[in-house]
Design a protein with these regions (language model features):
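N-terminal accessory beta-strand-rich subdomains and adjacent acidic, glycine-rich linkers
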Residues: 23-181
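Sec-dependent N-terminal signal peptides of Gram-positive bacterial secreted proteins and lipoproteins
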Residues: 4-22
Length: 181
């Protein structure tokens, strides 16, 4: 009986610890009557909680069920908010390079809180591209934009395309929701 009681107490402590650890990896950003937006501490992803249903949407595949199924660059792509595809204008080779946030060795990342959301500032120094991403709560929606005037290509590279939230995940298979580009 004592062993069973000890195991139950340990399981309760582990559950409390894992919830506390999960909360430490997110920064609360904005909230309205329906949604709550939080940012990952590495500034490369966010989560949106639907307060009415309890469902959480994530901008990345941070679900433990995916652990080990992807490796290397694919894992970093799956957990990055965006991938910037660039080409070298000086070399003129026409080849496209993927600049993945979590693969960027010289990533400069910061954020500013704004009304109803956050502006993420990224500087991908390896490719010489800096850009801002706005994530805002508007009523029952999440608006994600990369304003043209906040893109700066300061080296030999130019942006070909931006893959925004390539692996946006719903909280469960039966959760309603839409994604528009």
């Amino acid at each position: 009986m004592k062993k069973r009681m000890l195991v139950c107490l340990l399981m309760m402590l582990l559950a409390v610890f894992s919830v506390a650890a999960a909360e430490e990896t997110r920064i609360p950003v904005a909230e309205n009557d329906r949604l709550a937006l939080s940012l990952s501490v590495d500034l490369c992803g966010f989560e949106v909680l639907d307060k009415q249903t309890g469902v959480t949407w994530s901008s990345s595949m941070n679900d433990p069920t995916f652990t080990g199924k992807l490796a290397g660059l694919n894992q970093k792509k799956a957990n990055s908010l965006l991938t910037v595809n660039v080409t070298n204008l000086v070399k003129g080779a026409g080849s496209i390079t993927n600049a993945v946030l979590l693969n960027e060795s010289q990533l400069g990342a910061s954020y500013d809180l704004v009304e109803n959301g956050v502006i993420l500032h990224y500087d991908l120094a390896t490719t010489g591209v800096a850009l801002d991403v706005e994530v805002l709560l508007e009523d029952e929606s999440v608006l994600v934009r990369v304003p043209y005037e906040r893109i700066n290509c300061y080296a030999d590279f130019s942006i070909v395309s931006i893959d925004m939230m390539p692996y946006l995940c719903a909280g469960s298979d039966n959760a309603d929701g839409f994604l528009f580009y």
